[in-house]
């Protein structure tokens, strides 16, 4: 049954829709790489988002991620293998280490790597994001995976303010 709206009216409404924060959240400034913040924190989710981004990528695909502490340790090497297979550049970092040693989490992740691609390891997530955004070129895509909408980094029981998208917006708006 027809809703009695013209295509122009439908298109106008669609153009005003906003996506969900932290789910394939695209951040872009002309002349710089497209940065996508996504909550992908499981092997399947990481694979799906990387494959979707690869389809649109005209340059290199960067994947920045970490794995949460006090969570399923078995997924850590699986996510590394997926990122290594699907992306051109890997950046490993912290993602809510909770009560675990962030360096140990990164070592666990590295167990899934074959060594075929160089990996940049930076425990400080903000520094890792800075590295990825500055290294990527205009035709590249940078995926920042794992935290998505979360506005904190959980370390030793303390929630520190931390927002991937906000950090990216600040970096993209700064002169290169």
Each predicted region: which residue ranges?
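ATP-dependent carboxylate-amine ligase
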Residues: 1-176
């Amino acid at each position: 049954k027809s809703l009695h709206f013209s295509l122009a009216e439908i298109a106008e409404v669609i153009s005003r829709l906003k996506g969900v924060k932290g789910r394939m959240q695209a951040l872009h400034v002309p002349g710089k790489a497209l940065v996508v913040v996504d909550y992908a924190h499981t092997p399947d989710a990481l694979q799906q988002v990387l494959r979707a981004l690869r389809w649109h990528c005209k340059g290199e695909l960067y994947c920045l991620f970490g794995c949460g502490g006090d969570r399923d340790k078995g997924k850590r090497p699986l996510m590394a293998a997926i990122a290594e297979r699907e992306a051109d550049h890997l950046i490993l970092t912290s993602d809510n280490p909770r009560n675990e040693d962030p360096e140990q989490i990164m070592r666990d992740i590295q167990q899934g790597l074959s060594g075929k691609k160089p990996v940049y390891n930076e425990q400080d997530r903000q520094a890792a994001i800075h590295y990825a955004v500055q290294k990527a070129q205009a035709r590249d895509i940078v995926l920042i995976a794992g935290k998505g909408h979360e506005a904190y980094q959980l370390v030793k029981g303390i929630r520190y303010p931390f927002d991937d998208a906000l950090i990216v917006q600040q970096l993209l708006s700064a002169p290169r």
